[in-house]
């Protein structure tokens, strides 16, 4: 996971990590974790912090070393990216911005992508994703 980070990102994380590793022993306490992440533009909730710490802090001693920290940050960034990518993709389909993808909007985008679909195929795609049966696809269904 951490191998997907650029050298620049790793250097950035190392710098931030060092700022909070007061005694220079290569570990930070769980209390410092939130401060470190916020300094890097992340905005974790208390619950997220606790979950991350529980996942990373294998021995439960309340400290995290740099390799553990890198793994955690890589995971956090990946989650953020994919959520944002899904949102952007939804906006591409939701032409009128009303929060729903209609059959007409789906047909329009698929045609622009070079996919000539029959009305039946479009309706079938909508039906497969349309959990609440309103004939459209909302963000959650998407």
Swiss-Prot record:
Pfam families assigned: EF-hand_7
Residues binding Ca(2+) 1: 21, 23, 25, 27, 32
Record-linked InterPro entries: CALM/Myosin/TropC-like, EF-hand-dom_pair, EF_Hand_1_Ca_BS, EF_hand_dom
Binding site for Ca(2+) 3: 94, 96, 98, 100, 105
SMART domains for this protein: EFh
Source organism, top-level taxon: Eukaryota
GO cellular component: myosin II complex
Entry-annotated residues carrying N6,N6,N6-trimethyllysine: 116
PROSITE patterns (UniProt xref): EF_HAND_1, EF_HAND_2
Stretches assigned to the EF-hand domain: 8-43, 44-79, 81-116, 117-142
Binding site for Ca(2+) 2: 57, 59, 61, 63, 68
Keywords: Acetylation, Calcium, Metal-binding, Methylation, Repeat
S-S bridge residues: none
Chain positions with N-acetylalanine modification: 2
GO molecular function, a single term: calcium ion binding
Binding site for Ca(2+) 4: 130, 132, 134, 136, 141
Family the entry assigns: Belongs to the calmodulin family.
Protein role: Calmodulin mediates the control of a large number of enzymes, ion channels and other proteins by Ca(2+). Among the enzymes to be stimulated by the calmodulin-Ca(2+) complex are a number of protein kinases and phosphatases.
Additional remarks: This protein has four functional calcium-binding sites. Arbacia punctulata has two distinct calmodulins isotypes: alpha and beta.
Protein name, per record: Calmodulin-alpha
Annotated organism of origin: Arbacia punctulata
